[in-house]
Amino acid sequence: MIKLIATDVDGTLVKDGTMQIDPEYMTVIKELVQKGIIFAVCSGRQFISERKLFAPIKDQLLYITDGGTVVRTPQEILMVHTMPRDVWSGMCRMVQEQMPHCDCFVATPDYCLAEDAGSRMFHWLRDSYGYDIREAERLADIPEQDIIKFTVYHKSACEEMCAPLFTPAWKDKTQLAAAGKEWMDCNPLGANKGTAIEFVQKHFGISPEETCTFGDNLNDIEMLQNAGRSYAVANAREEV
């Protein structure tokens, strides 16, 4: 019997970077929750964006946000991974100094920070994803201690842009995962959607065999592997 369903969002339930979801999904999810099934939104998005997207049923869901670095109910954070300052600030400086065609931002459990409020990335996150994103004068020097994720952005080929320099430099210090064509998510080591699902399973006493997951991209692979039933959508990357 399935007790936990977890799904990715962008590329799985909605078109990347949009806030339009089929109303029928809301009806189905509500029916599943009424049957006692835990429904988890498992996305690279931040909490506020997930809440806006699922507004009609926002208080009935479990939230796995920022690529698996945070697990929370509507009321409280159950689990959070943070990243060492030297790691995220070092990645930030590399992007800003050596990758001129890319942009970047950092995430806390509740909001994001980026340098240029007029940039394409900033506007897309704020206006299309519904993010709470704030401008920082010098991103690498912000005082925030609870950084949970660093993300590189390129308008069409982020994975390829990161391959020559960024990925080799940081692949052993962070958990890297491409998220669509535009993003490279960098999580604390050991933090991904799969470890978040494992936490949820242990927290609620649910086995992998009682878990069903849906995804489409490389950052969904660990989540799909930790479920007795896992499904890649038709448009998923071949590796998935």
PLM region spans:
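Active-site metal-binding loops of divalent metal-dependent hydrolases
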Residues: 9, 45, 215-217
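Conserved acidic, metal-coordinating active-site core of Asp-based
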Residues: 94, 101-214, 218-223, 235
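Short, well-ordered beta-strand core segments
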Residues: 5, 63, 230-232
